[in-house]
């Protein structure tokens, strides 16, 4: 399943998101959700312990001036890669 987090993790039920993640799921951070990828924050630490791959939309990182603050554990993608993820995962959960 593809999970997409488009809101700030501070304004989301992040604990519920973590509970619903399963091995093999993937999480895409976009819009304000990219703030979860900032190195050193508590949300990133939780994601590091999850059995998933975490992606962030590079254009949203650039728009928020966060490119130099993102953890190396996060896979940066563009809109073409975003489309590939949606094709790969017919089931999606939006947060």
UniProtKB/Swiss-Prot annotation:
Q: Which InterPro entries has this protein been placed in? A: DsrEFH-like, Sulphur_relay_TusB, Sulphur_relay_TusB/DsrH
Sorted alphabetically, the keyword list is:
Cytoplasm, tRNA processing
Which is a Gene Ontology cellular component entry for this protein?
sulfurtransferase complex
Answer whether the UniProt record assigns the keyword Ubl conjugation to this protein: no
Query: What residue ranges carry the coiled-coil annotation?
Result: none
| Major localisation | cytoplasm
Q: Name one GO biological process term.
A: tRNA wobble position uridine thiolation
Q: Which Pfam families match?
A: DsrH (PF04077)
Cell compartment(s), UniProt: Cytoplasm
Q: Could you say which protein family the record assigns here?
A: Belongs to the DsrH/TusB family.
NCBIfam families reported in the protein's UniProt record: PRK13510.1 (NF010035), sulf_tusB_dsrH (TIGR03011)
Question: What function is annotated for this protein?
Answer: Part of a sulfur-relay system required for 2-thiolation of 5-methylaminomethyl-2-thiouridine (mnm(5)s(2)U) at tRNA wobble positions.
Q: How does it assemble?
A: Heterohexamer, formed by a dimer of trimers. The hexameric TusBCD complex contains 2 copies each of TusB, TusC and TusD. The TusBCD complex interacts with TusE.
User: Can you say what this protein is called?
Assistant: Protein TusB
What's the source species for this entry? Escherichia coli (strain ATCC 8739 / DSM 1576 / NBRC 3972 / NCIMB 8545 / WDCM 00012 / Crooks)
